[in-house]
Amino acid sequence: NNFDDSWGIWGHNLRKVLGKDAEKVYATIHGKTDDSQLCFSSEDMYRQIESYIVDNFGEKGNFRFVIAPDDTPYACTCATCAALGNTEKNATPAVTELILRLSQRFPKHTFFTTSSLTTQQVIDKQLPPNVGVIVSAIDYPLRRTDGKDEQDKKFAEQLDNWKKVTNNIYIWDYINNFDDYLTPFPILKIAQQRLQLFKQHGASGIFFNGSGYSYSSFDEMRTFVLSALLINPELPVDELIKSYFNQEYPVSKKWLYDYYTELENNAQSGKRLGLYAGIRESEKGFLYPEKFIKFYDEMGDFVSEAKGKERKKLHELQTSLSFTRMELARDHSFDAYGYAKRNGKDIQPLPQARKWVTQLKEHQAFAGMEYYNESAYEIDYYIKEWEQYILA
């Protein structure tokens, strides 16, 4: 589902509800009106949200609404917010009072606060059944989890504290490298361990934040596995991966399975996966160049041998991983994994480097492969830079 459609208010979208009237409810920060944050004790704020719900969803439906401050580190400290208990970096008191008021006004709807930045502090009162919390896992490192690490204990304690005041605990977690959608990101075994911990400590729902509508390598397989783990986090990950590849890739199933599960096992080293990682960090964590390059170079044979849907999917994967091959080559420059050799003062690009570029140009044939990261950096521009500055 599109969260903007299936939730009455989703994420940090409260300003969409307020529209031009947002200026009436700007926060007071350091004694001055500040348009970077909102005031949650404002009567105008309550009335505008109330009208929005009545006009668009009615009073008898069962919709969900997130009431969250903007993603900034400061809270409103106007006289009313301060009287409720707000401090410079804690908006929990005022946000809680607004949510409680809305939950009483609309008992059929459900309202969520967040546990992130200015609302990290847990509420100090029992919440009604139609109120919950969405806990951000942004600060919980993506790495092997055994429940004994200090970061594991810290996040588990946060969930336990929320469990004391509500049974409606959702987690907002992350499953992609947002600087590079195209390089493989072996998150499945780590995600399984996190799901087990979340469930053990009272979570009742999980949101996985991935690449959205943009293509991400192995994404269909990962979606298949994660969907199964959301139902039962005890299922064996390797068997789920094998099941998907057996079903969708009759020719290349073993080759894909062997390489992808190797990536997953590499990621179990205990090193942190970077949510915003360059190729060098990925290489240090799980993407061993020699193994990846062998896999990439073998791909052409499997594309040629496969037929129909499998061939199209392999061609799509080959195209996306050409970006990874080019990033490795760019980073390694003139060594065994690079794009060129030095000949005295001259630099001689390898013949295969132009083949990588040609292969990546085929991204236009595939839906969702226009950008390679969260910032919407265009693959076409990346190719242009290679042609103008690296291979020129």
Outline where the language-model segments fall.
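Structured mid-domain segments that build the active-site/substrate or prosthetic-cofactor binding neighborhood
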Residues: 37-47, 54-55, 153-254, 258
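Catalytic domains of carbohydrate-active enzymes that cleave complex glycans
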Residues: 229-392
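Extracellular/periplasmic catalytic domains that process cell-envelope and extracellular macromolecules
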Residues: 59-60, 125-128, 200
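Noncatalytic carbohydrate-binding groove/subsite architecture in carbohydrate-active enzymes
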Residues: 119-127, 131, 139-165
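Feature activates predominantly on carbohydrate-active enzymes
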Residues: 1-65, 69-107, 132-135, 160-186
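Acidic, His- and aromatic-enriched active-site or binding-groove loops in soluble protein domains
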Residues: 86-102, 129-148, 198, 227-235
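Short acidic/His/Gly/Ser-rich catalytic and metal-binding motifs that mark active-site loops
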Residues: 74-79, 142-143, 218
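Substrate-binding cleft/loops of secretory-pathway carbohydrate-active enzymes
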Residues: 111, 115-139, 182-187, 215-223, ...
